[in-house]
């Protein structure tokens, strides 16, 4: 394994461990970003269920013109996943950045989710 992959894997483990410690039964808002798209889902780890999800691949995003993995798409995904989570009765979550730095697309998604009603 390359040094970069090891560093990223360790960061991801460290983030997940700290999330488990502070979660207190709250679901987590998990973010995955690729070079072409961005994905977010609200996961209840106690039940093992996904409560809400959104990605830049969805038809609603394509119709609005927010495709790809830029900051505008991340904002739209954050807003959409927050609206779906609030609709399912989830108000408080723990933000799981998944080892990614809290900057750029990840930060834009988090800010949009906060503005749309999720608190973390």
Curated annotation (Swiss-Prot):
InterPro entries: Ribosomal_uL18_bac-type, Ribosomal_uL18_bac/euk. GO terms for biological process: translation. It comes from the Bacteria. GO terms for molecular function: 5S rRNA binding; structural constituent of ribosome. Gene3D superfamilies: 3.30.420.100. Keywords: Ribonucleoprotein, Ribosomal protein, RNA-binding, rRNA-binding. GO terms for cellular component: cytosolic large ribosomal subunit. Part of the 50S ribosomal subunit; part of the 5S rRNA/L5/L18/L25 subcomplex. Contacts the 5S and 23S rRNAs. Belongs to the universal ribosomal protein uL18 family. This is one of the proteins that bind and probably mediate the attachment of the 5S RNA into the large ribosomal subunit, where it forms part of the central protuberance. HAMAP family: Ribosomal_uL18_B (MF_01337_B). This is Large ribosomal subunit protein uL18. It comes from Nitrobacter winogradskyi (strain ATCC 25391 / DSM 10237 / CIP 104748 / NCIMB 11846 / Nb-255). The lineage of its organism: Bacteria, Pseudomonadati, Pseudomonadota, Alphaproteobacteria, Hyphomicrobiales.
């Amino acid at each position: 394994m390359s040094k970069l992959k090891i560093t990223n894997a360790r960061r991801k483990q460290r983030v997940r461990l700290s999330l488990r410690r502070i979660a207190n039964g709250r679901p987590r808002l998990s973010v995955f970003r690729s070079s072409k798209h961005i994905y977010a889902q609200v996961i209840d780890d106690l039940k093992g269920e996904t409560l809400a999800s959104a990605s830049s691949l969805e038809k609603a995003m394509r119709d609005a013109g927010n495709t790809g993995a830029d900051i505008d798409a991340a904002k739209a995904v954050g807003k959409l996943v927050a609206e779906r989570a609030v609709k399912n009765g989830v108000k408080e979550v723990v933000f799981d950045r998944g080892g990614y730095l809290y900057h750029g697309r990840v930060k834009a998604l988090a800010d949009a989710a906060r503005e749309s009603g999720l608190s973390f």
